[in-house]
Amino acid sequence: LGTKYAKKPLELDIPITIAGMSFGALSGQAKEALGRGASAAGTSTTTGDGGMTPEERGQSKYLVYQLLPSRYGMNPDDLRKADAIEVVIGQGAKPGGGGMLLGQKINDRVAKMRTLPKGVDQRSACRHPDWTGPDDLKIKILELREITKWKVPIFIKIAGARPYYDTALAVKAGADVVVLDGMQGGTAATQEVFIENVGQPTLACIKPAVDALQDLNSHREVQLVISGGIRNGGDVAKALALGADAVSIGSAAMIAIGDNNPKWEKEYNKLGTTAGAYDDWHEGNDPAGISTQNPKLMKRLDPVKAGKRLTNYLKVMTLEAQTLARACGKNSLHNLEPEDLCALTVEAAAMAGVPLAGTNWIPGKK
């Protein structure tokens, strides 16, 4: 990832990366586990709102540093330690919206990193303070390249709102990689009305983004990473067949390292839910010690064991996708193409731009 401009592009072993999830939203142990698991699988992990922790940097072979509108935890020295920089413009679960970290997660360490009072709700802005449009973004990217001496790739993360035009603008601004996040992406930092009603489904975003890259003669030169609801090898194979270069996972990685572990069933019951259905990650009461800053709960998560679980999950996802590629007669995942796909509904056919099963008809295609 990042072969167009960066002197040191990310060379990953698998086409699955770990998306940005902040220290603060997650415990330090969880961030360490993500770093360990991703590194053992030969892929990257991403910081999130709130900055870089020593545990995460120390255990991550490839670490992507997110630059967000809030600038919470932003440290130029940490930025130089990163293997790539991701400028976050939008998130699939809340395009056009900011975020919130509830006060019960703002302990002494989080407060110090974010320069905030302890125990007070933290609100994140939705707009960057030092640029307002694509022309400014181009200048910002050049600034970041100078800071890092043009060594590391610059990612631009956009939400699935206007994928064709947003992808085109990111490419013209000088992005090495476009990360496109569909509305199925998870978050614990916005209201339900956003989660349910704002943005486009991940499937509907891929083709317009690929079309934009092709129209600019930049497909494969500027890489496309798809996120938002990716769960298994089938999702990976479909995204790559539609033209993506890689995918990114967030909520699935949390489950892999031990969230919703049946071991804590009784405690999930006390919270009014059950293992396998718990998603109140914003409240800071996660019995598994992942989405919490409660010292008693955090101690329950062993980063070494949790990292191994994530590694196993990533390897199995990759093997599943490879198996599907072989079934299509391909010797590489990256040889998958739209011709290997068909859709089971008219809606899916129209969104993905592939024929309806049993026909040659692509709805909406002239």
Which functions belong to the PLM regions below?
Residues 1-110, 114-123, 136, 304-308, ...:
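N-terminal capping/small domains of soluble enzymes
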Residues 20, 122-126, 191-195, 299-303:
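A short, mixed-charge helix-start or loop-turn motif at secondary-structure junctions
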Residues 78-95, 213-226, 231, 290-308:
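Electropositive, surface-exposed helix/loop patches at the edges of structured domains
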Residues 125-294:
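Glycine-rich phosphate/ribose-binding loops and adjacent secondary-structure elements
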Residues 259-265, 272-333, 337:
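Active-site or pore-adjacent capping/gating segments
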